[in-house]
Amino acid sequence: MSAKTDEILEQLKSLSLLEASELVKQIEDAFGVSAAAPAGGMMMPMAMPGAPGAAAAEPEEEQTEFDAILTEFPSDKKIAILKVVRSITGLGLKEAKELVESVPKPLKEGIAKEAAEDIKKQLEEAGAKVEIK
């Protein structure tokens, strides 16, 4: 690596979680990109367009990784949902609030079906609507 990239890497290592989160948002805004992984991104390389039988083979494979996505919530239940989101994700209050306010947003990605169902149950009990993909 060049000296410039080494210096940038060292500066990134020194950032707090909050600063890193703010940096990601600024990069997303500046370059018009999203740091969120696309839903089902792991499955895309398996089926190549034009490959014979690619479409037929895909439905037979059982999905093993799921995403729990917070889709909506009533505003009067926001505090209860924030508490559940913080306990599930381990995020700080500000990060959890930003996540909840930017629905629909994945809370956890690439998790087992049981874990996704548990997250869905907890959030629905708090009043939120959750999708599992």
From Swiss-Prot:
Q: Which GO terms describe its cellular component?
A: cytosolic large ribosomal subunit
Residue ranges of the TM segments? none
Q: Which UniProt keywords apply?
A: Ribonucleoprotein, Ribosomal protein
GO-annotated biological processes: translation
List the Gene3D superfamilies: 3.30.1390.10, Single helix bin
Pfam families documented for this protein: Ribosomal_L12, Ribosomal_L12_N
UniProt superkingdom: Bacteria
GO molecular function terms listed in the Swiss-Prot or TrEMBL record: mRNA binding; structural constituent of ribosome
Where does this protein have coiled-coil stretches?
none
Name the InterPro entries on file: Ribosomal_bL12, Ribosomal_bL12_C, Ribosomal_bL12_C/ClpS-like, Ribosomal_bL12_oligo, Ribosomal_bL12_oligo_N_sf
Q: List the disulfide bonds.
A: none
The record's annotation in CDD domains points to: Ribosomal_L7_L12
Could you tell me which PANTHER family the record lists for this protein?
39S RIBOSOMAL PROTEIN L12 (PTHR45987), LARGE RIBOSOMAL SUBUNIT PROTEIN BL12M (PTHR45987:SF4)
Record NCBIfam families: L12
Protein function? Forms part of the ribosomal stalk which helps the ribosome interact with GTP-bound translation factors. Is thus essential for accurate translation.
Subunit composition? Homodimer. Part of the ribosomal stalk of the 50S ribosomal subunit. Forms a multimeric L10(L12)X complex, where L10 forms an elongated spine to which 2 to 4 L12 dimers bind in a sequential fashion. Binds GTP-bound translation factors.
Query: Which family is it part of?
Result: Belongs to the bacterial ribosomal protein bL12 family.
Q: In its UniProt entry, what is this protein called?
A: Large ribosomal subunit protein bL12
Instruction: Look up and give the organism this protein is from.
Output: Trichodesmium erythraeum (strain IMS101)
Name the gene for this chain.
rplL
